[in-house]
From Swiss-Prot:
Keyword presence, Ubl conjugation: no
Its biological purpose: Functions as an E3 ubiquitin ligase.
UniProt keyword Plastid present: no
Pathway linked to the protein: Protein modification; protein ubiquitination
EC number per UniProt: 2.3.2.27
Catalytic activity reported: S-ubiquitinyl-[E2 ubiquitin-conjugating enzyme]-L-cysteine + [acceptor protein]-L-lysine = [E2 ubiquitin-conjugating enzyme]-L-cysteine + N(6)-ubiquitinyl-[acceptor protein]-L-lysine
UniProt name for this protein: U-box domain-containing protein 54
UniProt entry keywords in alphabetical sequence: Transferase, Ubl conjugation pathway
Gene3D superfamilies: HUPs, Zinc/RING finger domain, C3HC4 (zinc finger)
Natural source organism: Arabidopsis thaliana
């Protein structure tokens, strides 16, 4: 079965309906999840001059509006032929949509995401992303997540899935018309999906091909532990603070991944800037990097002789 498709939707159905319809038309949808980040009103009795009961009523009303919107999106999916049991929803409350979407990606180990992209009302193919939330997601989502960025029902950017652990934004691809081509009646599929590729999973990592050793003056016999020591991915597995392989990787506000306890020690010792960039941290929150944890676990199982 193909990986589930996750679609990030707004409270206003008019804004996200075209994004959802694009996913239903262009991707092979067997299981679909509707994601929503609810932004509660920040009201206090002192600033609003309202009673707490009135504030609670307003916030409950807004939450109900978000829930009802998800029901409307679900109905759209069902009307387009998706079985009701194959439509699910996931909602969290937060103060930033981009951060909320990234948190949902990590929580659900999402590998296929469709979301709105441009804030510019004048759509053009190949246009740059102007939405701050889309830019944030493109930079902070794990590389195992393929992302389609949609504007007014059209694909404008696509970030391919990969297992390279550098900057997520490096894996962007420009607009491709092939993803917009209609497909045979009764079928929906992603035209940009590579044929005959192995089914992707966030817990998988591809082994690097052996490079030819023509003319190299290297020792022929190497132990398995030495080979694993030379694996370039090791640098991505290590915590920037302790330089040891991470067991509990978490993403900090600077966008880099750290061993959770090492980062907390950094804060307890008085650190207020990023250990990587030395720039002030916007907050001290940590988001679990489930995908990287799985990749590291698999790598260690394949390299049992690695000296930690």
């Amino acid at each position: 079965m193909e990986d589930a498709i996750y679609v990030a939707v707004n409270q206003d159905v008019r804004e996200s309906k075209k994004t959802l319809l694009w996913a239903l038309k262009n991707l092979q949808v067997k299981k679909i999840f509707l994601l929503h980040v609810h932004l509660p009103f920040s009201l206090t009795t002192s600033s609003s001059r309202l009673e707490q009961s009135e504030i609670d009523a307003i916030q409950d009303s807004e939450l109900n509006t978000s829930v009802n919107s998800l029901y409307k999106y679900r109905d759209i999916c069902i009307n387009k032929g998706v079985n009701e049991k194959d439509v699910d929803t996931s909602m969290i409350s937060g103060h930033d949509v981009g951060e909320g979407i990234v948190e949902l990606i990590y929580q659900n180990i999402i590998t296929n995401l469709v979301m709105g992209a441009a804030a510019d009302p004048h759509y053009s193919r190949g246009m740059s992303i102007t939405s701050r939330k889309a830019e944030y997601v493109s930079q902070h989502a794990p590389h195992s997540c393929k992302i389609w960025f949609i504007c007014k029902g059209k694909l404008i950017k696509q970030r391919e899935r990969s297992f390279y652990l550098g900057n997520p934004s490096d894996s962007f691809s420009e607009f491709s018309t092939s993803a917009e081509k209609p497909i045979s009646k009764g079928r929906r599929r992603d035209e940009e999906e590579e044929p005959e590729s192995p089914k992707e999973h966030p817990g998988w990592i591809l082994e690097p091909e052996e490079s030819p050793k023509k003319g190299r003056k290297e020792t022929i016999e190497k132990s398995k532990s030495n080979e694993s020591d030379e694996d370039p991915r090791l640098e991505d597995f290590k915590c920037p603070i302790s330089m040891e392989i991470m067991r509990d990787p978490h993403v900090a506000a600077d966008g880099f991944t750290y061993e959770a306890e090492e980062f907390r020690k950094w804060l307890r010792s008085g650190g207020r800037t990023s250990p990587k960039t030395n720039k002030p941290l916007e907050n001290h929150n940590l988001v679990p990097n489930h995908t990287l944890r799985i990749i590291i676990k698999d790598w260690l199982e394949k390299n049992p002789n690695y000296k930690r």
